[in-house]
């Protein structure tokens, strides 16, 4: 089983006719994702990457029954693309775009709260690698061949560390149910907590690897929630152990600005709530293997 997407999930690609949209739409289709259409204003009626193109998300949903989209839209227009998808009734939107202004994402968050919670669109990203349920569907930009189907969930703020974890686990014969890149921006569409709750409900996910980084309270909040609400083993990691205070390290949200933001502090918080913490990125696979062996 998996969370968020599977082989039947009907997917739209917003911005499909651009260079990035074209490349990754082809990659997703080749992987086996159920891409049913694309959206580019002014290019409706054409066929691209073997699927129909529509002018609006609403038109695309009405014609294809899509429930999910991935957006390859430039930063100045990315927030509007997310809100258009929400207005069309999509359940899930994955925003790959890096560089969306924080004020725009605040506007998106406010806009989505207009909808009742049960009808509210889940946004994954922005500035993320996307989602993959190995062997079923890929909604993102990750190299699909490094993922082995299995029973470990992965949630990561960093796309490339998520890749590293997948590659190490595959070498050890450990598979992944779903891997979610939530993105490295200060304001995310969804958090560790949102996806942990889904993994808790998935009977075929037996453990979760949670990869965080410096900056923000997400890791501490998730660790506290895990202690009280999560029944499966969780392996944690926090990138940025050597990062100096006040200096951004890669992602816009990766900056130590308050007590509890540093990697060492977050790792200690994880341990205090019962998580097993991987000591370094080279130990993802071995740490997951040790935890699974103890839980068997």
From Swiss-Prot:
Pathway(s) of this molecule: One-carbon metabolism; formaldehyde assimilation via serine pathway
Any one GO biological process: tricarboxylic acid cycle
Active-site residues, record numbering mapped to chain: 251
Enzyme superclass (EC): ligase
GO terms assigned for molecular function: malate-CoA ligase activity; nucleotide binding; succinate-CoA ligase (ADP-forming) activity; succinate-CoA ligase (GDP-forming) activity
InterPro entries: Cit_synth/succinyl-CoA_lig_AS (IPR017440), Citrt_syn/SCS-alpha_CS (IPR033847), CoA-bd (IPR003781), CoA_lig_alpha (IPR005810), NAD(P)-bd_dom_sf (IPR036291), SUCC_ACL_C (IPR005811), Succinyl-CoA_synth-like (IPR016102)
PROSITE patterns, per the entry: SUCCINYL_COA_LIG_1, SUCCINYL_COA_LIG_2
E.C. number: 6.2.1.9
Swiss-Prot/TrEMBL catalytic activity: (S)-malate + ATP + CoA = (S)-malyl-CoA + ADP + phosphate
Keywords, ordered alphabetically: Ligase, Nucleotide-binding, Tricarboxylic acid cycle
Entry binding sites for CoA: 17-20, 43, 96-98
Keyword Nucleotide-binding annotated: yes
Cellular component GO terms held in the UniProt record: succinate-CoA ligase complex (ADP-forming)
Keyword field contains Signal: no
Family: Belongs to the succinate/malate CoA ligase alpha subunit family.
Subunit structure: Heterotetramer of two alpha and two beta subunits.
PANTHER family: SUCCINATE--COA LIGASE [ADP_GDP-FORMING] SUBUNIT ALPHA, MITOCHONDRIAL (PTHR11117:SF2), SUCCINYL-COA LIGASE SUBUNIT ALPHA (PTHR11117)
Protein name, per record: Malate--CoA ligase subunit alpha
Gene behind the chain: mtkB
